[in-house]
Amino acid sequence: MVGSAIVRHLLAQGVAQSHIITRTHAELDLTNQAAVQEFFAQEKPTQVYLAAAKVGGIHANNVYPADFIYQNLMMQANVIEAAFQNGVQKLLFLGSSCIYPRMAQQPMREDALLTGTLEPTNEPYAIAKIAGIKLCESYNRQYGASHGVDYRSIMPTNLYGPGDNYHPENSHVIPALIRRFHEAKLANAPSVAIWGTGTPRREFLYVDDMAAASVHVMQLPKATYDQHTTPMQSHINAGSGSDVTIAEVAQTIAQTVGCAGQIEFDTSKPDGAPRKWMDSSRLNNLGWQAQVHLREGFAKAYADFLGHL
């Protein structure tokens, strides 16, 4: 999803299609070290956007914790090492807001990293993403001066939009709710069940806004990026700047879809962290702002869902 949005943004900036190299998971398994090394040796890219990841909601993280930590660690390590071995000087790693402690002060600043206990429901994924940040920082520290390595990290909040995964069990909250309300609408269901209490607050960012943020951070002069980060805390948050309750999200999506069923909250299911809202002032001060508001973004996401039925 994010990779496709980055491609759209680069094309809109005037980058030639022939200068953009992409691979689907079917074409290149990033957990296969030899295959990744071969790809970099053949293609010789000059910049890398590392957007690939195994992602999912609370259910998927609970059921497949080993997959989430192993696959993400392997993908990150293989790509970053292969990039270095093949002379790539500029790389941007995309992480996640779940890197921050469960009870971090809100909004979460970049310096909250590693200051407390992680949210248990997605700890393996979070640890993998923290490792990705530290991989970038470690390569910069060891090879920055000698090889010109400049590997950066950006931490998106919860993303949604075209190209999302709408699987009924393994998707994130917005695509899961879009599917659930759409199916309830078709079935004229009197009610729709939502996991948890509906009270947790979350921040959401439209994927094309994230693509713009990613390209913006990648293109910053090194001196500017270094001025706003430190060698041991080099990541930058990317969020919309506001958060909403899950109940509000459900109500807005129901209205977008046109589902009249009663929303019922299953309080026997986990909520996850009580609040996740990121402080994106560092990125805002560097010249980026989110553009797409939730209601507009949900409408675009629902249109994308309908287009893939």
Pin down the residues of each PLM region:
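N-terminal Rossmann-fold NAD(P) dinucleotide-binding loop
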Residues: 3-4
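C-terminal substrate-binding subdomain of Rossmann-fold SDR/epimerase-dehydratase oxidoreductases
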Residues: 7-9, 13-14, 183-309
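Adenosine-cofactor binding site in Rossmann-like domains, unifying the SAM/SAH pocket
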Residues: 11-38
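SDR active-site strand-loop-helix element
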Residues: 23, 48-54, 91-97, 154-156
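NAD(P)H-binding glycine-rich loop region in Rossmannoid oxidoreductase-like domains
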Residues: 33-73, 85
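Conserved Rossmann-fold NAD(P)-dependent oxidoreductase catalytic core, especially the SDR/UDP-sugar
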Residues: 77-122, 152
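NAD(P)-dependent short-chain dehydrogenase/reductase
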Residues: 103-112, 137-222, 241, 251-255
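Active-site helix of classical SDR
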Residues: 124, 128-131
